[in-house]
Amino acid sequence: MTEGVNLDELDQYLSSDESPENCMMLSDLDGLLHGVICSPIPISSDVWMAAGLGAEPKELPNWVVNTLTDRYMEIAQGLAHDPMVVEPIFWQAKAGHLIAMDWCEGFMKAVSLNPKEWLRLSESGSDGHLMTPILLHMIDEQGNLVTSPSVIENLALDTYKKRLDNRPMKDSLEHIRTDKGPRLL
């Protein structure tokens, strides 16, 4: 699905001195977009662009805003498709394995924009368990956070971590696997 959006140009911009100082890199930003789209309540583009790029949309080059809007629509269409089409942007290490942590951090940044709503979702017992694969990339083997989350993100992570501690690993991941790999709602 990502053929329609020029992600190479966006990646170059995000890595350049022209981008805002506090902007996310491409994988983080893609995780943020997925989180915004999956949010229990709508998040305005002004809010998520400022969170992801460290600047208001009016302060950004038009092509950057347009590219992000196109990627947002691409993700939303994939998630609305039956079956869902999810193509997250992960980095690949030189050794060949995928690095999902940056994407997961971006997703959790979206969670931090409406933490109470996400907490309600997790406590409702409906779909909160689907966060398990994302959170697994945020916690090391000893159960410690591998990033420095804000207080709000920490609240959400603690809630999910408690659920992880009370659930066998195989059971927590089994329900989100399909023949084509992991799903994200």
Task: Please tell me what each predicted stretch does.
Residues 1-185:
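Domain-length accessory/inserted modules outside core catalytic folds
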